[in-house]
Swiss-Prot record:
Record gene name: cobD
Keyword Transferase recorded: no
Record field: transmembrane: 54-74, 78-98, 152-172, 203-223, 295-315
Protein name, UniProt field: Cobalamin biosynthesis protein CobD
GO cellular-component term (any): plasma membrane
Species for this entry: Listeria monocytogenes serotype 4b (strain F2365)
Mode of membrane association: Multi-pass membrane protein
Length: 315
């Protein structure tokens, strides 16, 4: 029965994505992080911000777990059908496959129309780097990198934790991931208060990122891209990133499409030097964005099928 709930959550994400007008736990988690960060910055200063960052992590993830568990508990007390609906809905909100694909397609269409200014604004909504000076090719690369990375932490990781611990654990993972996306930067403003969140996100994504690489390789073979290069580049360039995890899915995609990703970018006006991922020399355009979206859907479906099969065998 629980497997049916997980399947329903996955299908809902495939069909609906994340409608902007719907209530969403991740939005609430983001607001909680903003509120806690403001309060902690008023109390702690200097080196003590490292301790504040630890508190921020514990409070955010802890409150997410407690509140989501209580909502499920309360719904079960009211009616079983309500419990099922809440269970499925909470699981669905942790998955970002269709939402990610929609955002990438918007950028793809805008680039195809030649509206570079609008494409810069759109890509700025899904990446952390500065986008006001990006070329069309750089926008395409930024989009591809984000789709590749979020195949891991926006789909495969929440699926992984959903199958292990239900929507409560999946939402706790999303809290970790949201913390990293909001405060896990290495610049002067966030280095201290975001240190714990960044490290814990690295730990939480350690297994899912490597699974994402494997599923993307399989997807590359299925889609008749360069599956062999996807395997090789993912392994060869796995350390070519400031994160210990991101280069795995990015390398798999770079190899599959025969392109080069990564390199030096600007974040909040500061230049961050990164090595490149991949060795392909062909120009990158909106065509490669479309191919990356195909990889996203295929790898995510493979992940769900494999996780569901393992769940059936064990339970």
């Amino acid at each position: 029965m629980i497997l049916l709930f997980y399947t329903s959550s996955f299908i809902l994400d495939c069909l609906l994505g994340d409608p902007y007008s719907w209530p969403h736990p991740i939005k609430a988690i983001g607001n909680l992080i903003k509120w806690l960060t403001i309060i902690l910055r008023k109390i702690f200063h200097g080196k003590s911000l490292y301790f504040a960052g630890g508190l921020l992590f514990v409070l955010t993830v802890g409150m997410t777990g407690v509140v989501s568990w209580f909502i499920l508990f309360l719904s079960a007390k009211i009616a079983y059908w309500l419990y099922v609906a809440v269970f499925v809905y909470l699981g669905y909100t942790t998955l970002a496959m269709t939402c990610l694909a929609k955002e990438a397609r918007k950028i793809q269409r805008t680039l195809a129309d030649g509206d570079l200014a609008a494409a810069r604004v759109q890509v700025g909504m899904i990446v952390g780097r500065d986008t006001d000076k990006l070329t069309a090719e750089e926008i395409s690369k930024a989009t591809i990198e984000t789709v590749a990375e979020n195949t891991a932490d926006g789909v495969i990781a929440p699926l992984f934790y959903l199958f292990i611990g239900g929507p409560v654990l999946a939402l706790m993972y999303k809290a970790v991931n949201t913390l990293d996306s909001m405060v896990g930067y290495k610049n002067e403003k966030y280095r201290a208060i975001g240190f714990v969140s960044a490290k814990m996100d690295d730990i939480a994504n350690f297994i899912p990122a490597r699974l994402a690489w494997f599923f993307l390789v399989i997807a590359s073979f299925i889609l008749r891209y360069d599956g062999r290069a996807s395997w090789q580049i993912g392994l060869r360039d796995r350390k070519n990133h400031t994160s210990p995890n991101c280069a795995y899915p990015e390398g798999a995609v770079a190899g599959a499409l025969g392109i080069t990703l990564g390199g030096t970018h600007e974040y909040f006006g500061e230049t961050v030097i990164k090595p490149t991922i991949g060795s392909g020399n062909k120009p990158v355009s909106e065509k490669e964005i479309s191919q990356t979206i195909h990889l996203l859907y295929t790898a995510s479906t493979i992940a769900f099928i494999i996780f569901a099969s393992i769940y059936l065998l064990l339970f």
